Amino acid sequence: RALPSGQVSIRSYWAFLIASSILFVFSAWMLNPLAFYLSSVALVIVFFYSLTKRFTAFSHFWLGLAISIAPVGAWVAIREEISFISLLLGAAVVFWLIGFDILYSCMDVDADRVNRLHSIPQRFGVEMALKVAWVSHAVMVVFLLILLESMVLLGPVYLAGVVLVAGLLIY
């Protein structure tokens, strides 16, 4: 990590953060009004994530929300609307990321304890965390199956992909 190790100065960090944020909001403004209005919400969600591990075991949920901005944001950029389909796709991403991040956190449970960082494996144990990850991935598969009707043009290719992903997660 560049900032804690001193490879990047705090001044450089803030300059990059401010410049990136301005570029993000400007880019959203260039896309369409809805993207522009939602850009500040997206920034708050993304900025707040890095703090969540310091005070809640449910930081995995916040990370899922932050990453789900990408598919919903792409939808807003292209279609200039938020639809049920885009929210369902975003929800699938939320639950995929929750499960994935919990699995990843199981490998870091000891480091989380030492550094007093919060995670589901650190708070509830690895066994319970694995169950939460499984449920999260199952919810994701359900959302992807609900999307099947909307992805009618993809038909069997989409369904095969969902079945393959579900099979890999079960394996």
Positions of the model-derived regions?
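Membrane-embedded alpha-helices of multi-pass transport/permease systems
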Residues: 98-117
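Membrane-interface elements of multi-pass transporters and channels
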Residues: 33-34, 55, 80-81, 106, ...
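Alpha-helical transmembrane segments of multi-pass membrane proteins
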Residues: 46-50, 92-104, 163-169
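Alpha-helical transmembrane segments
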Residues: 85-96, 153-161
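Multi-pass membrane catalytic core of lipid/isoprenoid biosynthesis enzymes
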Residues: 1-39, 114-165
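Intramembrane alpha-helical segments
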Residues: 2-88, 171
